[in-house]
Amino acid sequence: MKYGYYQICEALQSAADNSSYVNSVTWGNIFDVDMRKMTLFPLCHILTGTAEVLERTVIYSIDVLVMDAMDYSKQDPNVIPYSFEGVAQKQDIYHRSLFSLQEMIASLRRGDLYTDGFRLVNDPLCDPFDEDFESTVCGWKATFQIETPNPTIIC
């Protein structure tokens, strides 16, 4: 198997597509994504970071964002009893998008991506976000450090 930049892109695309929550996957500058297209959501957006080229391996640092568009609930959170699930959409989005990142992390640790030679070398810290792009979105961002064999090693 080859382990270049294309393959890491295909592997992450596959992991996001296999998530139980993600509807579409985009790459590159987040501001190039048409956030008004509601059919994109829930969305996984991947930002290429650095590539540390070592003698036998390459370690890619890649930011992965999983998000959904918010439609604010009319439920008053001060009314008792209050249930987050199914009522507070922001909480639902946080729950589902974090779970999607956990699925991707599991695939890199012991699933198909690990079997294919992609190894997660960090314990990703997931950060929640709440942004107003062209639509109001929220979700989680994680930075993955993924190690692959260096395809150009010299014997």
Regions found by a protein language model. Give the residues of each.
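A short, highly charged nucleic-acid-interacting micro-segment common to nuclease
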Residues: M1-Q7, K90-S97
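Short acidic, S/G/P-rich loop/turn micro-motifs used as interaction or catalytic elements
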Residues: E52-V53, D71-S73
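Short glycine-rich beta-strand segments
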Residues: D63-Y72, E147-P149
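Short, charged interaction patches at domain edges and termini
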Residues: M1-S14, V53-I59, R110-C155
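A solvent-exposed, charged loop/short amphipathic helix patch at secondary-structure junctions
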Residues: Y72-I93
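Short, hydrophobic/π-rich interface segment
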Residues: D92-F118
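A broad, low-specificity signal marking well-ordered, structured residues that form hydrophobic/aromatic
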Residues: L43-C44, I62, A142
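Small/polar-rich, solvent-exposed N-terminal microdomains that initiate assembly or binding
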Residues: M1-T57, S107
